[in-house]
């Protein structure tokens, strides 16, 4: 039986909530796999040490994981986070999935400049691909329930044709947060005005003005959905290869 684990890093748990919102479809998936680790869902064994200034949580991440779903970014200031993400990569035999914007491209955690209570020393966050090799990345804040189910189903069935775009997104990490749409498409006049980015944006940060996208930086949360949906975001790279 396929072993699946959900590893929670620095995130809001929104991606896991999106996964559990699938209800019957989630039950179908869980009926065909073995959920070996999911701290939030199953209350896995942890060792908690509390001191005057911090709370330390030691997680027992099992080995032999077939599909690891990693939610949240990595805190570079926390050696426990670093240990957990390295252990997850070592214990994942097949696919490691960056689930959601924080894991895939850094998301809103990249806006952090100083630490906050209750962990004031935690100030530096990066997407997990900056630390380990990521096989698949599913952007969104959070990803839609349907997209999570389809990705998991394809991974279980070994549908590499369906998974290929997610493997491609995983290669770009923080560059695929939506900034690449501005830099590689809009600024280079490659946009064809299809409006797919505006339709996909989860926070309505993109307006179509005279058939061209106008991105409101005050609303944008760097979720990467527009990058994943844009049909021309990789055109400049293809052109460079041809040249």
Swiss-Prot record:
Function text: Reduces the physiological low-potential two-electron acceptor coenzyme F420, and the artificial one-electron acceptor methylviologen.
Amino-acid positions noted as binding [4Fe-4S] cluster 2 in the UniProt annotation, renumbered to this chain: 201, 220, 223, 226
Domain 4Fe-4S ferredoxin-type: 182-210, 211-241
Reactions it catalyzes: oxidized coenzyme F420-(gamma-L-Glu)(n) + H2 + H(+) = reduced coenzyme F420-(gamma-L-Glu)(n)
Family that this chain belongs to: Belongs to the FrhG family.
E.C. no: 1.12.98.1
Top-rank lineage group of the source organism: Archaea
Residues that bind [4Fe-4S] cluster 1: 191, 194, 197, 230
UniProt keyword annotations, A-Z: 4Fe-4S, Electron transport, Iron, Iron-sulfur, Metal-binding, Oxidoreductase, Repeat, Transport
PANTHER family per UniProt: COENZYME F420-REDUCING HYDROGENASE, GAMMA SUBUNIT, F420-NON-REDUCING HYDROGENASE VHU SUBUNIT G
Signal peptide range: none
Descriptive protein name: Coenzyme F420 hydrogenase subunit gamma
UniProt subunit comment: Complex of alpha, beta and gamma subunits.
Molecular-function GO terms, alphabetical: 4 iron, 4 sulfur cluster binding; coenzyme F420 hydrogenase activity; flavin adenine dinucleotide binding; nickel cation binding
Cofactor section: Ni(2+); iron-sulfur cluster; FAD
